[in-house]
Amino acid sequence: MSISDLMSVLMMIFLFISIVYMRSVNLEKNKITSIAQTYETTQVEITNDLKKEFTKNLQIWNAVLDSLTLSIRFENPEILFNVGSAELNDHFKSILDSFFPRFIQILTDPKYKNDIEEIRIEGHTSSEWAGESSPYQAYFNNMELSQDRTRKVLEYILSQIKDEQLLHWTKSKLTANGLSSSHLIYNPNQTENKERSRRVEFKIKTNAEQQIIRILEQSK
């Protein structure tokens, strides 16, 4: 075999390897694209169902549906808890009695149920604390308070579920997260909006990210 023939064979082998590699890359890319599209579709459909279910209630509850973060945010601190307290106000309990069963019914619909990774209850506070606490101490005081509050919300809504299968599924997805003042809400002039920063959010996380990570790991 001449050198030119050998080079031709090597080039063919290299070309074949390149084609196989590119095909593999394209397959993985298509899988990830498909998951991303499915995630986007699922997020839009969940948002639309939440809007349809709660549009008439959100303003009454002083709540906001955020389609970007897939969350419902309760923003009126006066109806949530007493100042400095983790105990739920009766009015907030009545809101949760109306909100959560309908909320969880949407998420346990067969078209969404297997896509739900986590339902986060997030407690947020302003940066201030009563007295002359330093900003550092105020942060940790508010961290403890926000954690206590989300735990109380978690305890209350779970106590209202009587169906054992639904309770088991909800417990496997629901988490309580106290975040103190780490995610403040700001006014247009970039000053802290202390009232709106004090809030409770129910945030939905789908498993699209985990599916993409699994594909990437399998492709290594």
Identify the role of each PLM range.
Residues 60-73, 117-119, 126:
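Short edge beta-strands and adjacent turn/loop segments
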Residues 35-42, 84-95, 141-149, 194:
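Extracytoplasmic/periplasmic, Sec-exported soluble proteins
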Residues 65, 114, 169-170:
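Short, glycine-/polar-rich solvent-exposed loops and beta-turns at beta-strand/coil boundaries
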Residues 85-120, 154-159, 202, 210-220:
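Periplasmic peptidoglycan-binding/anchoring modules of Gram-negative envelope and division proteins
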Residues 124-213:
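Periplasmic OmpA-like peptidoglycan-binding domain that tethers envelope proteins to the cell wall
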Residues 54-59, 112, 167:
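Short secondary-structure junctions
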Residues 1-55, 67:
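Short terminal targeting/anchoring segments
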Residues 68-97, 128-141:
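Short, solvent-exposed beta-strand/turn patches at coil↔beta or beta↔helix junctions
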